[in-house]
């Protein structure tokens, strides 16, 4: 019996290894939050940067299985990262007047003494409807956190503001139409701005 050529054996091993490697699946990575729950690092809805100084986002409002989408871009180089900037807001109906707000903040938690410690939803008159507390720093990359908030009947336009421990409110806020999910970014500067019906998207 003639021994198989060495080249044929190596080729067979290479094909087998390629097939095995192609079958491997990687589960989404998670990090542990200081409040005990896992935080997906590859969560859908997180803001992704394209590496060229811009952040591309797509906002989605879903109710009753239907969704409306809006896509736009924000020049992140224009943001003052000392402020807790709101760069994206998506809404999901949670039944009745309850709405789940998923808010993406962009703040330099690494380069500041304090970190972005909450975001909140307000009426146009400035009355707080709800707040999402943030218990620890989140580096400098944009990050998204969600909270379910009751929106009063007749309220169709709200303001979402970020807050950080050092500078308070300021930076970019987002005015949101709670029925369509449309958003409008507003540069407030270092102090919180006042809003009215004319600011709604």
Curated annotation (Swiss-Prot):
Protein's UniProt name: Putative lipoprotein Hmuk_2215
Superkingdom to which the source organism belongs: Archaea
Positions bearing N-acetylcysteine: 23
Residues in the signal sequence: 1-22
GO CC field: plasma membrane
Region (Disordered): 25-78, 182-201
Membrane topology type: Lipid-anchor
Organism this protein belongs to: Halomicrobium mukohataei (strain ATCC 700874 / DSM 12286 / JCM 9738 / NCIMB 13541) (Haloarcula mukohataei)
Lipid-modified residues, S-archaeol cysteine kind: 23
